[in-house]
Amino acid sequence: MSLSVTRENFDEWMVPVYIPAPFIPVRGEGSRLWDQQGKEYIDFAGGIAVNALGHAHPALREALNEQANRFWHTGNGYTNEPALRLAKKLIDATFAERVFFCNSGAEANEAALKLARKYAHDRVGNHKSGIVAFKNAFHGRTLFTVSAGGQPTYSQDFAPLPPDIRHAAYNDLNSASALIDDNTCAVIVEPVQGEGGVIPATKAFLQGLRELCDRHQALLIFDEVQTGVGRTGELYAYMHYGVTPDILTTAKALGGGFPIGAMLTTQDYASVMTPGTHGTTYGGNPLATAVAGKVLDIINTPEMQNGVRQRHDAFIERLNTLNVRFGMFSEIRGLGLLLGCVLQTKFAGKAKLIAQEAAKAGVMVLIAGGDVVRFAPALNVSDEEIATGLDRFALACERLQAGGASCG
């Protein structure tokens, strides 16, 4: 018989690095979840932009079960068919010629930064080690990636941090230009800053970074962990901007809920990563790559990408209507189905409170800092689910505006 558990057990048994919601989801289908008490929620959080096809998608369940009935894991001393097939699909769909599989976005970014440093050291010299990143970015929680992230809140307790990482202002080409020089080995940037407030880059900014990297022989890394796999209405956001990076990192939606990450690059850059220079025990395991292959088959279609753009318009229209009613947001921004509602000054710092009230009303949303409510729903969310979820979100806004919301 299974052990009966409650939310209170989290506080008793788990390392307290999270403060989970007061309810425990136990079942999901599409864009709906149900908790232990049977309450239904519309899911606009998507596991933080992970559940690109919603919960328990039948094609993903079939792919997982089919591979689970064969074998689960062999380690990196062997390759496997699902990993090779997924690598070829990613290569055919993008600029890439080589793929490295891992288990998360942080691992993918770690691999990208290590590759950039090694390439510069091998081809130029050890002095070419500088990394330019951006303030309020998020690239993961390893010591290297959290240092690149440019949010002291996440890194200040773990000094000394890796050296030679400097941070420019996002969407400010002059700020970046002042830091990028011949000793720079890489520039890492999110096409849309997700955790930093759902801020899309301007095309001129990314084009300018491309030109600066070319001028100084630095590698341009696009962190597409949150924007990738259809989230923005293109398979990857670099396609939306028409700016091609040297390295692209992807994770989250790639597995549709099954942990996987990948670093994509060209043959020339990949060639410096010789046997033993990097690795991972679980990366590219057949369960993850079988599921991810099916995710890519479904999402990498004109129908799906057109659908994301249409759903973007539906969200924006309804959010604008809601904002006319409540006047809570100073800006509604984002690309595709990665959207952020910036709170007016009078509601500053209350994004988490709105998210808590939304959950009480039966809709799950995210935050991106204290002042931005973030939406990252499934790419196949239905019109009815959008309408129902935003009606529930309106109840949370109404409660907050009336002053009846409280933390907890």
Swiss-Prot record:
Q: In which pathway does it act?
A: Amino-acid degradation; L-arginine degradation via AST pathway; L-glutamate and succinate from L-arginine: step 3/5
Keywords recorded for this protein, A-Z: Aminotransferase, Arginine metabolism, Pyridoxal phosphate, Transferase
Residue ranges that the Swiss-Prot or TrEMBL entry lists as coiled coil: none
Enzyme class, UniProt record, top EC level: transferase
Reaction(s) catalysed by this chain's protein: N(2)-succinyl-L-ornithine + 2-oxoglutarate = N-succinyl-L-glutamate 5-semialdehyde + L-glutamate
Give the EC number.
2.6.1.81
**Name of one Pfam family that matches:** Aminotran_3
Q: Which family does it belong to?
A: Belongs to the class-III pyridoxal-phosphate-dependent aminotransferase family. AstC subfamily.
Q: Mind telling me what this protein is named? A: Succinylornithine transaminase
This protein's species is: Salmonella agona (strain SL483)
Name the encoding gene, please. astC
